[in-house]
Amino acid sequence: MIRHECGLFGIYDHDDAARLAYFGLYAQQHRGQESAGIVTVDKDGMHDHKSMGLVPDVFSEEVLRRLTGRTAIGHVRYSTTGSASQRNAQPFIAHFKGQDIALAHNGNIVNAAELRAELENEGAIFATGNDSEVFMHLLVRSLRHKDLPEAVAEACSRLKGAYCFLVLSGSTLVAVRDPYGFHPLALGRLDGSPVFASETCAFDLLEADYERAVEPGEMIVVDTLGEHSSRLPGPHPAKPRQCIFELVYFARPDSYVFNEQVYVCRKQMGWQLAHESTPDVDFIMPFPDSGVYSAVGFAQCAELPYEHAMIRNHYVGRTFIQPTQSMRNFGVRVKINPVRAMIEGKRICIVDDSIVRGTTMMTRVKKLRELGAKEVHIRISSPPVKFPCHYGVDFSSRGELIAAQCKMDEIVKRLDVDSLHYLSIDGLLRSVMHSDSFCLACFNGDYAVPCEGCAKFSLECKRS
């Protein structure tokens, strides 16, 4: 329903680096379904393959055999900056003074337009509309007088916004997370080799051990001398501002994100929601899959029957993964189908994780009405999304957001439901352990990194 920007994976010094990167990306396919790529490095240099499509469609056995080397980084992408085209697929590779540098990025750099203009005035040439390329230019410039870790740190000091980077060059792999820690990055261990991933579900698939989260503002350097951790230079915020939508929607429920168990958080959100507002209905039902875990918590707290009265077609991609509105509407129609026998004459409470634009909810409620539902009540396990996100989530203007454009009674009328209740911000924060460490800007407009005059970075190349 809502698109995220990407997922990262990296592994250092392992016999089967490319294949492990493949499965690490496969486990994080939910974070990006437009393109996928892997870069490996050996004594002969870098080897890469990237293309549009899902991980199993992009990589074959033949391709993986060609990606030789014991160190790899990988990327799955959804376009939040730059268009959905081959040239924007990552990882990026740059060549500088006989040195190859590969970059994979998760996030959104809010001052990228300003930095790009500065770089272009100094003669830089850009091939994509991607904010990640801005960082690559800064990195290469710093490499003129610094080694790779120092250059990464210097380049990061110019950035504002959200970023997790994996940077690979020769025998050095650098992992870095922005000082606010907007998006997750985890460190694990497989057969003694360090492994990095956006989500820990990648470690589970590989039977790697999860060690810890990469901390906000931390840079981890892995090279032939071992592993070294340091803090990025410059001032750091007193508290992180981690994206709570990772817990509400994006992350897989079997992942640990920001040192929180996603499954437990979502059940707690449902539990808190039921405490706030439980309608008189025959049963609780989720919209699979993202609403399932909140609905379980809601039903348990409310002591009401829980039914799977919506069946998902698992062979249809996420509604918002395709970038055109016509494809989005098609996805809404075919992705989920109600069980007719469960709907007619029933008073139903639908529990879902969020309403952003409202397109999906309107279509599904209409279908329930057509099948004879007596009452349809909606309970949402997050607060109303009223403000755009500048840090890498696909709602970049208030005009897209139904809660920003309509009052509650207007939303009820537009959705054609009998009642609607969103989880309060207080209820949301009671559902997590580290309640003072989250970005809530999409709910309350309190932006940690201002993006004045910028409805999210949009440097579309005219050639894209």
Language model features by range: what are they?
Residues A124, H145, T278-V281, Q300-E307, ...:
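Secondary-structure transition/capping motifs at alpha-helix termini
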Residues H137-K146, P288, Q300-R318:
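Amphipathic alpha-helical
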Residues I284, G291-F298, A302, Y306, ...:
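Extended, hydrophobic alpha-helical segments in both membrane/secreted and soluble proteins
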Residues C156, S171-T172, R189, E207-A213, ...:
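PRPP-dependent phosphoribosyltransferase catalytic core
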Residues M1-P216, V221-V281, F287, E375:
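Conserved short alpha-helical segments that host acidic/polar catalytic motifs at enzyme active sites
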Residues F59, T128, E133, Y306-G317, ...:
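A conserved beta-strand->alpha-helix junction
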Residues E303-I348, M362, K386-S396:
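Short, glycine/charge-rich flexible loops or terminal/linker lids adjacent to PRPP-binding catalytic cores
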Residues A18, T80-T81, N111, F182-H183, ...:
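Flexible loop/turn segments at secondary-structure boundaries
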